[in-house]
C-alpha cells in the first residue's frame, strides 16, 4: 500500500466542507474533517481509511478512562451518511469498528479485518504491526529526549517552558489557532504533554476521574 495523508489544514479547506456538516453544534475539528475528505478525493486516492476506534488502553499507570471521545469514534458514521465518498465520488470508504482494550485485541482485530477486506495473510499483518510499534516507540523516545533537553535548558537559563495540555488534534496549527507560535516567537519553548518525561507515571489516586474520555484532565 502507498499511504497518502490529507493536506495541511487551511481555512479554505474548512469552508469547502461546511455544506455537508450535519450539526452546527459539533466541534470545529469535526467540521474540518469534511474538508479533509474532499482533499483526499482531489488527490486521487483510491481508498479512504477512517476507522471507528471506541477504546484504546490508557497510557497512564493508574486506571483511567479507555474510551475515545464520542465525536472521534462516531464521526466516521456521520461522514458515511453526510459525504458518502463511495456514492458521491466513487472512492471506497473503510470504517471498520475496533475495540482495542489491549494490544492483543488490536492485533486480532487488525488481522481479521485485513484478511476479510484485502485477503492479507495474518503473519504479514503481524510483521507490519510490529514495525509500526517499533517506529512509534522510537518516535516517543526521541520526543521525550528532546522534551527533557528543553526542560534542562530552561532550568539552567532560569526560564520556563509551556506545556499545552490538549488533545492530539490540537497539534494542527489551524485548530490551535497558532497558540504555540505565540509563545515560541517570544522565546518560550512549547511542549506537548507526551514530550514531558514521566507524564504517564503521574499518581492520579487523589484525583476524581469524572470523565469518560481520554485526553481530558481529571478534577483535583
Q: Model-derived features: where do they sit?
A:
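Beta-sheet entry/capping signal
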Residues: 1-4, 45-49, 90-92, 160-161, ...
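Short connector loops at secondary-structure junctions
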Residues: 2-25, 96-103, 188-211
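Non-catalytic structural scaffold of enzyme domains
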Residues: 5-28, 37, 42, 106-109, ...
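Short acidic, glycine/serine/threonine-rich loops at helix termini
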Residues: 15-20, 58-67, 105-110, 174-177, ...
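N-terminal glycine-rich phosphate/adenylate-binding segment common to multiple enzyme folds
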Residues: 21, 30-93
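Hydrophobic alpha-helical scaffolding
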Residues: 23-30, 65-69, 99-100, 169-173, ...
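A charged, amphipathic alpha-helical module
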Residues: 98-197
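Conserved small/polar residues in nucleotide/adenosyl-binding loops
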Residues: 215-219
Amino acid at each position: 500500500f502507498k499511504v497518502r495523508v490529507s493536506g495541511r489544514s487551511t481555512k479554505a479547506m474548512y469552508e469547502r466542507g461546511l455544506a455537508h456538516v450535519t450539526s452546527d453544534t459539533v466541534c470545529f475539528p469535526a467540521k474540518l474533517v469534511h474538508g479533509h475528505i474532499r482533499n483526499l478525493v482531489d488527490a486521487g486516492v483510491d481508498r479512504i481509511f477512517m476507522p471507528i476506534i471506541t477504546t484504546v488502553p490508557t497510557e497512564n499507570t493508574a486506571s483511567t478512562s479507555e474510551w475515545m471521545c464520542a465525536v472521534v469514534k462516531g464521526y466516521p458514521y456521520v461522514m458515511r451518511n453526510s459525504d458518502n465518498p463511495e456514492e458521491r465520488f466513487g472512492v471506497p470508504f473503510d470504517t471498520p469498528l475496533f475495540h482495542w482494550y489491549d494490544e492483543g485485541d488490536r492485533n486480532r482485530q487488525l488481522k481479521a479485518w485485513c484478511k476479510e477486506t484485502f485477503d492479507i495473510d495474518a503473519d504479514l499483518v503481524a510483521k507490519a504491526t510490529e514495525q509500526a510499534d517499533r517506529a512509534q516507540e522510537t518516535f516517543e523516545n526521541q520526543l521525550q529526549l528532546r522534551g527533557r533537553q528543553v526542560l534542562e535548558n530552561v532550568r539552567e537559563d532560569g526560564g520556563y517552558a509551556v506545556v499545552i495540555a490538549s488533545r492530539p488534534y490540537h497539534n494542527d496549527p489551524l485548530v490551535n489557532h497558532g497558540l504555540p507560535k505565540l509563545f515560541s516567537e517570544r522565546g518560550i519553548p512549547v511542549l506537548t504533554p507526551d514530550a514531558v518525561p514521566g507524564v504517564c507515571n503521574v499518581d492520579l489516586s487523589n484525583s476524581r476521574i469524572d470523565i469518560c474520555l481520554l485526553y481530558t484532565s481529571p478534577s483535583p
